[in-house]
């Protein structure tokens, strides 16, 4: 028997299709002639790259196969990619990768680079040649980047997603899922399944909005709870089939600590800094600035984050925070698109008030360098009393709402969700 690893990416487009659908079909077919080593993998890559379709996800799967079946399996994969990829869209550039034997450790490092950085096709071709990986490019073949990364990702931390697919005649039509049943299931399975609904808006989150074949995607950390949730939701249209993926979704895979001067466009990062410019608003987006010992950075809570912006507005100059998110150019300025933040130290907020009249307790009013009582006319030298105003921010992590959350960002309700933020506190400054 031979270990055969298969990676696929960039088969979809905004018009339709889904790489997970193609991957699920292949996993079912190949499992008839080879032994799966695990569930298929869904690996989310750098969420900031400009040419992603939707979630920038690649798929991979591994089998024990007989030597005589290897060519048959490879041909099946290539034929299905040719048949089902969205070649009508100019930005669809599929890539397929085959690796036999053990997965090289170097490919694991490549996988994380594909999540943290912006890689190009040459980077993928070079590592493929070095590792003797078999690559197949369709058109530009950009998909080989994700295909290699999906094979190489070790999924040391992972979640599950159950994806149910629609019958073809329903593709492109409104999805029919009973809303009340989704809320009921969420109530019974949360937090072992999560991001099913947005309670603050009363909306369902498991149904995508595009023309792709996915009816629902149910995420969770307990595979059995995910299956139970699926079985207890009421669907008002037929389901073709479903597939469970192991995935790096909601693992914070994309976040690494960086100094501000080290940041580049398309990075995802955690930074630590002091607020040097209080918030301002433009087009319903909320901005502020922080600095560390290497430079300053604009930070943004964009309009889709809704109520999260309320907490951003509570920050004032002098506050020290840890902030996490994606880095991009916005109106020509390098900007951190905020996903979560943690106030480490809150500066004191002080106001100064006039004292009461010492004679009659009346209200004093300012008269140049003096205060004069409105009631009895008593005068005294102006002395204002400092008063500390309580800060509404707590020393805790604040995160964007579920419908604004990136695929890789870990909800605070999950185990280890605070680790990457709090680990920054352990670093020497």
Curated annotation (Swiss-Prot):
The keyword Thylakoid does not apply. Its EC number is 6.3.4.22. InterPro entries: NA-bd_OB-fold, NA-bd_OB_tRNA, TiaS, TiaS-like_TCKD, TiaS_FLD, tRNA_Ile2__agm2C_synt, Zn_ribbon_TiaS. One of its GO terms (biological process) is tRNA wobble cytosine modification. Gene3D superfamilies: 2.40.50.1010, 3.30.70.2200, 3.90.600.20. Its main location: cytoplasm. GO terms for molecular function: ATP binding; ligase activity, forming carbon-nitrogen bonds; nucleic acid binding. Residues 271-343 bind DNA. One of its GO terms (cellular component) is cytoplasm. SUPFAM superfamilies: Nucleic acid-binding proteins. It catalyses: cytidine(34) in tRNA(Ile2) + agmatine + ATP + H2O = 2-agmatinylcytidine(34) in tRNA(Ile2) + AMP + 2 phosphate + 2 H(+). Keywords: ATP-binding, Cytoplasm, Ligase, Nucleotide-binding, tRNA processing. It comes from the Archaea. It is found in: Cytoplasm. Belongs to the TiaS family. ATP-dependent agmatine transferase that catalyzes the formation of 2-agmatinylcytidine (agm2C) at the wobble position (C34) of tRNA(Ile2), converting the codon specificity from AUG to AUA. PANTHER family: TRNA(ILE2) 2-AGMATINYLCYTIDINE SYNTHETASE TIAS. This is tRNA(Ile2) 2-agmatinylcytidine synthetase TiaS.
